[in-house]
Design a protein with these regions (language model features):
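Extracytosolic ligand-binding ectodomains
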Residues: 2-9, 14-16, 23-29, 33-417
Length: 417
């Protein structure tokens, strides 16, 4: 999977997603720096192929936008910043190999990236072994900042608990108490099903079944037939990426939306864009949304992003990449150092400024477990919407009101002596 590194000039950057087609890329520093200044290197391990390629592309473009801003503002400690990108293909083993290459051979100072929770868990462990700061941009399983929390890891996206708590009450109150889960068979899906089940039991509901589907499944017919026979009030579709697109298309082909409510936790703009109109339905949760007319700086961010993405608007994934790279930069400049422990300590409690937060309620990285506490954007899909107007945000739920405490999540952070 290793493809020889190549530099991306300005013209290819403006090609958006096409610029991330290769497996190993170097995005060079821009700005006015002395030729003798050695760049600060940040390695990004994200999927450019496979089930989550579209989500990975958005995270990468968001990070590139941040990189341009960072270097125009003076970089890190007055040095240019360089972004080195590797394709994880959503394979945990490959992701670790790429991370070790970035740290060992390319000498990156920091790591970031991930869409798959399985990859996040693997990079979480590898970063600890490498004693290198790692920001999990988009792998959600509770364990990353819960029972498997590490001093070297921070996370920008939500936990699965926050995703499920973002719309559980709405689904339960509106659509019924008997649920059936269609669950991707890896850490992300297991974590979502566990979190919804816990809330469902407490509310007096019932799990009628939980069918596991391997990541990368293309034919969901046998799973959907099984769910249809049980006749739940709600089919909770926990798949993601191409799996969500395929499962929703097939569920509608079976007419299941006429027999039960189809809903879920996280949904992404990339997935909605890939679905046919008839498959766009249900109540879900976004983690960030591009249309926030009353929120300062969002319109400017959207306009700038579109110039880098061939006219496409940013998604939550775009914001994950954007905010994560800015956060690393802010922490390093605050620490006035590049060693891992100093930057980690500077990042604990870090509050994103409005032009980076791009949402209300002052998102911050919680010191005790390194989890970003931002907002959830629950709502419903606009079946008759035209891209990118495909989702109605019904509410903005502050993360501070729904996040479990570090103790409840099982995080016991330890630091090197």
């Amino acid at each position: 999977m290793d493809i020889v590194s190549r530099r991306i000039g300005r013209r290819s950057v403006l090609g958006g997603a096409a610029a991330v087609a290769a497996g190993s890329l170097v995005y060079p520093a821009r700005g006015t720096f002395a030729a003798s200044e050695q760049p600060v290197k940040i390695g990004m391990v994200d999927p450019q192929t496979g089930t989550f390629a579209a989500e990975g592309a958005s995270e990468i473009i968001g990070a590139k936008l941040a990189l341009d801003q960072i270097n125009k503002a003076g970089g890190i400690l007055g040095r240019p910043v360089e972004l080195l990108i590797e394709d994880s293909a959503s394979d945990p083993g490959l992701a670790v190999t790429k991370a070790r290459k970035l740290v060992g051979s390319d000498k990156v100072n920091f790591l970031m990236g991930s869409v798959s929770s399985a990859v996040s868990l693997s990079l979480n462990q590898a970063a600890d072994e490498l004693k290198t700061l790692y920001v999990d941009t988009g792998g959600h399983t509770d364990q990353v900042t819960g029972t498997e929390c590490r001093w070297t890891t921070f996370r920008t996206c939500s936990t699965t608990w926050m995703l499920t708590a973002g719309n559980f009450k709405t689904l339960f109150d509106k659509f019924g108490k008997n649920w059936y889960f269609l669950t991707p068979d890896y850490a992300y899906g297991h974590s979502l099903a566990k979190d919804y089940s816990k809330q469902l039991a407490k509310a007096g509901g019932k799990v009628l079944g939980n069918t596991l589907s391997p990541l990368g499944t293309t034919d969901f017919s046998s799973y959907l037939i099984k769910i249809r026979e049980v006749k739940p009030d709600v089919m909770v579709n926990l798949t993601a990426g191409n799996d969500l697109v395929n499962s929703m298309k097939q569920a509608v082909q079976f007419g299941m939306e006429k027999e039960m409510t189809i809903a879920g936790a996280q949904i992404e703009l990339e997935d909605l864009a890939a679905m046919p109109k008839e498959a766009r339905l249900g109540w879900w949760v976004m983690e960030w949304y591009w249309d926030q007319p009353n929120q300062p700086h969002v319109a400017d961010f959207v306009a700038t992003y579109k110039t880098m993405a061939g006219g496409k608007p940013p998604s939550a994934r775009s914001w994950f990449g954007f905010a994560s790279l800015h956060a690393i930069t802010m922490a390093a400049n605050k620490a006035k150092a590049l060693d891992t422990l100093s930057v980690v300590k500077a990042m604990e409690g870090l509050v994103l400024p409005p032009e980076i937060a791009l949402q209300p309620n002052n998102p911050f990285y919680r010191a005790a477990d390194h989890q970003m506490i931002a907002n959830e954007f629950p709502g419903y899909v606009l079946s008759d919407g035209q891209y990118p107007n495909l989702f109605h945000v019904a509410d903005i739920v502050p993360g501070t009101t729904i996040a479990l405490s570090p103790a409840e999540d099982g995080c016991k952070m330890t630091y090197p002596t």
